[in-house]
C-alpha cells in the first residue's frame, strides 16, 4: 500500500526527508531518521491503533511505560529524528518504536493498560531549557520560566534585596538554607550560586557546604584577580563551577589580568559580550580561551534597532546607579557598545559563544531565553545564509542543533548537571517540552516536569472541551501538591550532600550533587566549541576574528514576536 506524503504527515506526522518550518522564522529542519515503522505506527483515538489486543499489550506496569509520546519529532544537539519516546518513573527510558510486541515487530517501548499516551504527531519535542543566570528576585519567575519551556534554573538571590537585584548571589549559610526551603515546592529544578567575592577561602567553603552548587564572582562585590583566584581554588577543591561577572571599570586590572588569574582553569564567563558587565570594551576576547565557557544573556539577543536604547535605563536601574552622577552615567555608557553586540550575533553563529541565559529581572527576561535564541538563529540565517555544515542538505539542521545546545546541554555540562538534565537522552529526568511547529520557540503546548505534565496551554476550564478560548498557560497537576517535590530536584555540591543537608533542612525534594565540573573545557561544549583569536579595537570597539571584521546590521523586525502576542 502506498500513501502520499501529505496524507501520511496528517495522520502520523512528517517522516524522513520531510521539512518543517520553525515558527515564523526562516529556519527549516529535515527529519534525519524515523524510528517508527511504516504501517505499524501507534496512534491513540477512536478506531485507532492503541487498543487492547492491537497496539496495547496485556503486560503489567512493571513491563510497560508510564507514558509514551507517539510519533514525535525530537530536536536535540545530537539529532533531528522522529520516534516514540517512553517515560517511566519520571525518566526517559526509551527512544524508538512503541507498541505491542505480541502483535507488532521490533517493539522496544511497550504500551499496556498502565500507560498514558501523549500524541506527538506533528509536534516537536525538546529538552527543558536550563537557565544558568537567574536572579532570584521573585518566586513568580518560576511560572514565567516554566511556561516558556524552562525546567531548570541556576542562579542566586534572596528576593528583591538590593544585592540580589544586581548580583546573582545567595550569600551565607542562613540565606542558603532558607532559600532551599523556599524552593522545595516550586515545580522547577533549582541550583544556587554563593557569593564568591572573597580573598580567603573560609567564607566560600561554608557556603559550598551549606548547599550552593557554584560560586559567583561579581564586580559589584569585587572581581579582582585575588577574588577570582580564591574562588577557583575553592571550586577546584569541591568540584563546582565559578561564574564570573568581570570588572567593567578595569579597576583592579584589565582583561589580560583576569585571564591570567584563571591560570588555565575552567570558568563560566557570564554575558561575555560585555553589555551585562565585564572588562570594557574587550571582555569578549574571553570567547577565544580554551578554558573559558562563555555565555550570553538575552537582552542583547539578537542585535536590533532597539537594543542599545533599551540597555541604558536597564543598566542604571539594575546596578543602583544615579543618573545625576556623571561617573555613573559614564560607567553605563562604557558597557553598551553596538560593535560588540553585533559581533556577538556572529560569534554565536560560529559556535564561539556556547550558551544563552536570561539575567532575569536584572537586565534580562526569564521567559524569553528560548525565543531570543531562535530569533538570533533566524537573524543569522537571513544575514549569513546556510552554514557550511548545512550546504549539502539545504536546510538548517546543523544550525538548529547548534542553537538548541546553547540553552540545554551546554549549560547543563557547564554546571555539572548533564547527568540529570539538558537533553532528550535515555536515563535523564523527563523534563520535556512539546511544541506545535508553528508555535516553536515561543509558545509550548505541554511542559513535562519529571515525567508529569506541570504546565500547558489550556482553554476555558468551564468549557465542554479543553480547547476553547481563552487559552492561558496554567499550572497542571504536576505542579501541585506532593507531586512537585517528587518530580523536581535541587542541585548542590557533593560536600553539601555529605553533611546530611536534606534531613537537616527538612526538605522533601531530592538533592542531586553536581559533578565532573572542573575537568570541563571549551572543547566539551556541544557544537559550540570554536576558540578563535579575537581582538577589539580600544578606540572604535570593532571586533575582529583572525583579523576579519565581525559586524552585521540590526534587524527592525523579528519573528516569534508581535505575530504571537497581543502586547
Curated annotation (Swiss-Prot):
Residues that coordinate or bind substrate: 218
Domain Urease: from-to ranges: 128-567
Class of the enzyme per the UniProt entry, highest EC level: hydrolase
Binding site for Ni(2+) 1: 133, 135, 216, 359
Record text on cofactor binding: Binds 2 nickel ions per subunit.
Gene Ontology cellular-component terms listed: cytoplasm
Binding, Ni(2+) 2: 216, 245, 271
Pathway: Nitrogen metabolism; urea degradation; CO(2) and NH(3) from urea (urease route): step 1/1
Superkingdom, taxonomy of origin: Bacteria
Pfam families for this protein: Amidohydro_1 (PF01979), Urease_alpha (PF00449)
GO MF, any single term: nickel cation binding
Compartment list: Cytoplasm
GO biological process: urea catabolic process
Reactions catalysed according to its record: urea + 2 H2O + H(+) = hydrogencarbonate + 2 NH4(+)
Statement: the UniProt record of this protein carries the keyword Ion transport: no
N6-carboxylysine modifications at: 216
Catalytic residue list: 319
Cofactor(s) the protein requires to work: Ni cation
PTM statement from Swiss-Prot or TrEMBL: Carboxylation allows a single lysine to coordinate two nickel ions.
Subcellular location, principal: cytoplasm
Alphabetically ordered keywords of this record: Cytoplasm, Hydrolase, Metal-binding, Nickel
Family: Belongs to the metallo-dependent hydrolases superfamily. Urease alpha subunit family.
Alphabetized NCBIfam families for the sequence: PRK13206.1, PRK13207.1, urease_alph
Subunit structure: Heterotrimer of UreA (gamma), UreB (beta) and UreC (alpha) subunits. Three heterotrimers associate to form the active enzyme.
Protein name: Urease subunit alpha 1
Gene name, Swiss-Prot/TrEMBL: ureC1
